[in-house]
């Protein structure tokens, strides 16, 4: 499943190709995604100039003067820049055809992604109550510590909650907890402010490295040009069961937290 670094990588990849370009056609081959593509999507977007491409959590916002297309990649979705007349393949669900001869094509074998529309996207019900971005200044140890008070869940479950902070999925939660030396099974309310500050620092480091590396190659994720991300070989703990811990001589163990697997030394 594409996580924040993968979505950020996609945003950075497509932006130079579609920024300030006009959408001259939208080709919808199959509108049956997680939610059906709205019938008026073509009316909303055709002949509109793309003024920016933004990311909020794991959503991409294709902004025009009168509103934004909200794209979620779901579990297996990807966006590619192609020549406008490139024949579609299986699972290619829609194209945004632009006035520079290229198209932005969405592919999604599992169809858990979505394409929605909002006049003010940050007020949309899917985005309005989300937590802060992990790489922004407002995400601090003090903030995280205050949110954790009286929470009776593990620290790993806590930081994976998008209403606490967005974009810290299973892989990056595992890596951040490993880097900060915090037991993933520890109750969130029992983590001190000092250790929360260390955890926030680790989250920022891990996510920045993943973005710089182009995302994590896990099953379905590809960059905007179809090439695979290449961060997986840089992970310290995730998916490293029984392999030596880089910080000690002990083997990395697999445990289950909240129905998700977690690897730890």
State where each predicted segment sits.
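Glycine-centered secondary-structure boundary/capping sites
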Residues: 20, 47, 129-132, 181
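Generic detection of long, well-ordered alpha-helical segments
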Residues: 1-4, 134, 138, 192-200
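Phosphate/anion-contacting hairpin/loop surfaces
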Residues: 65, 69-167, 172-179, 187
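Basic, nucleic-acid-binding surfaces and adjacent catalytic neighborhoods in DNA/RNA-processing proteins
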Residues: 22-40, 54, 70, 145-265
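A cross-family signal for N-terminal binding/gating loops and helix N-caps
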Residues: 1-113, 238-247, 260-265
């Amino acid at each position: 499943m594409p996580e924040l670094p993968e979505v950020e990588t996609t945003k950075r990849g497509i932006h130079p190709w579609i920024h300030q370009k006009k959408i001259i056609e939208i080709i919808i081959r199959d509108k049956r995604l997680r939610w059906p593509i709205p019938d008026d999507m073509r009316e909303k977007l055709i002949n509109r100039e793309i003024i920016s491409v933004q990311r909020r959590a794991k959503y991409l916002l294709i902004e025009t003067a009168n509103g934004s297309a909200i794209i979620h990649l779901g579990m297996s979705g990807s966006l590619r820049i192609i020549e406008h007349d490139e024949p579609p393949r299986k699972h290619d669900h829609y194209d945004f055809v632009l006035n520079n001869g290229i198209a932005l094509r969405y592919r999604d074998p599992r169809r858990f992604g979505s394409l929605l529309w909002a006049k003010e996207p940050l007020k949309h019900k899917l985005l309005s109550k989300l937590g802060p971005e992990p790489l922004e200044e407002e995400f601090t140890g003090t903030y995280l510590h205050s949110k954790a008070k009286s929470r009776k869940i593990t620290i790993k479950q806590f930081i994976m909650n998008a209403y606490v902070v967005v974009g810290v999925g299973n892989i990056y939660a595992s890596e951040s907890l490993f880097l900060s030396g915090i037991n993933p099974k520890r109750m969130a309310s029992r983590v001190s402010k000092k250790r929360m500050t260390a955890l926030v620092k680790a989250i920022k480091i891990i996510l920045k490295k993943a973005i710089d590396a182009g995302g994590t190659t896990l099953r379905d994720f590809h960059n905007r040009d179809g090439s695979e991300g290449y961060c997986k070989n840089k992970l310290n703990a995730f998916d490293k069961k029984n392999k030596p811990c880089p910080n000690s001589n002990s083997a990395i163990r697999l445990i289950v937290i909240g129905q998700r697997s977690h690897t730890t030394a």
